[in-house]
Amino acid sequence: MEIMESGDPVIQWDRKLSELSEAAESDSLYNNTPFSELLDDSALLDVLGQLMGDPFLTEKYEMMEVEMNPSSPSPMIKAEHSYSLCGDSRPQSPFTHASSDDNFSDTDLTGDDWCLNGELTATTPTTKIKVEIPLEETPGLTPSVTLATSAVSASPEVGVSSQLPVPEQVKLLSPVALPQIKLEPHEVDQFLNLCPKEVAPTEALQMPPTPPSSHGSDSEGGQSPTRSLPPSSPVQSQAGGKMAARSPSALSNSPLLTAPHKLQGSGPLMLTEEEKRTLVAEGYPIPTKLPLTKAEEKALKKIRRKIKNKISAQESRRKKKEYMDSLEKRVENSSSENSELRKKVEVLESTNRTLLQQLQRLQAMVTGKVTRSCKAAGTQTGTCLMMVVLCFAVIFGSFTQNLDMYSSSSKTIHEPSQYSAPESYAASIVRSRKLLIFEEHQAVEELHSSAVMLETQDTWEVQADTISKQQAALLEELHLSQEKPFSLSNDSSSDMPVRHRFTSEFGHNDTTKVIELDRTVNTTS
């Protein structure tokens, strides 16, 4: 027995599904179709009679305690069974096969344990109590009862009435807080149902389902647990609600299993070949008529569970094989794309190499042209500079020849004065002298002609002799002039100039030069 406190989000625990789900998510599975439209009065009485008159509910379990919230409104009755998605046109209920011969009395309906209301509406989530009966002690179609006061919104999957035609034998004991009855028959065919909360995550993840495992609920005829991810957003919950209207699973329409409604009621029992073969293999007798005994029902449930496990395992292997095939195709496509990309890379590398080679060739050609143009420009500038230097040398050479000619003539003329200069400053008194040179008209012409005529070594020797003679004559004249006394006076007075005549021979020509020396001695008193 599980009790959920009010005020928190109601979480329903389903022993068959082994999963947690929000109440708002499970509410989308039910609709507001009146239960009276699905069952007539006699069928409703049969359902309530079997529910209330079951000896295991009255003997084994004590009175169920329901903790109700006084502020919560009356809940609505919700019935849920596993064969609502079967191929049969009418909705199947686990209690429609029950006959009116079952024990049904007013005392069973007047107990304080059961409270029903004709108009049940729930607005706030409150306490939920769920009771499940073990299979070993119950008949094959004994339901598990869930009492809850949670707010429920219905879907077209399972017909649950919000307005129930209640028989006269039913008493309304607590009009304020009434429990919600959830019928969950523990039939083996519950495994055939599709839960939208299971379908949505598997389709979202696109992963192969795992085969059902041997869980504790399997031994009781329940569905093997399948864990599903809780919805992370309202979009996923809406998708789960839409998936509830899908077609039933291949297991529910499998020809290997007998339809659930054929196992109800009375009459001959027609089992499938797979069920008969499995029963014989397990060593159980094959039942041929209804209703089934407890041993036959237990054996049939076990066999049907094995067949369903086999079918689900085959389906799982098939989906896994499809998934692996898709993965192999993806690997093949990826490998082919990888090889194509490698080929493209190789082509691009070869193209890059050729382009680099062409670039190097172009660079070499450009550098060769540049060096040739630079060499040509260098040779042109060098030629121009050489021409300029040559012209300058020619001009400068002609100018220096003229200067040499005049300098040689001046040296020959002024040479005696160089020897007389130190003699004139030898005296202790201040002296001023003045050298006057008188040349005849033909002196320059003779000097020029003598410079041109000197070509051989003999002429140079003759000139050297004449020069030495002239120097000796000049020295004698200087000695004679120094021996002459000077006159001392305050005013400048000039004596008669002393004239010396000497003859110098240049070549075969005689040149007469008159050198007049004026000496004036100024004496300061």
From Swiss-Prot:
It comes from the Eukaryota. The chain crosses the membrane at residues 383-403. Belongs to the bZIP family. ATF subfamily. Its main location: endoplasmic reticulum. One of its GO terms (biological process) is response to endoplasmic reticulum stress. Residues 301-330 are annotated as: Basic motif. Residues 1-382 are cytoplasmic. It comes from Xenopus laevis (African clawed frog). Pfam families: bZIP_1. A motif (S1P recognition) lies at residues 433-436. This is Cyclic AMP-responsive element-binding protein 3-like protein 2. Residues 299-362 form the bZIP domain. GO terms for molecular function: cAMP response element binding; DNA-binding transcription factor activity, RNA polymerase II-specific; transcription cis-regulatory region binding. Residues 341-362 are annotated as: Leucine-zipper.
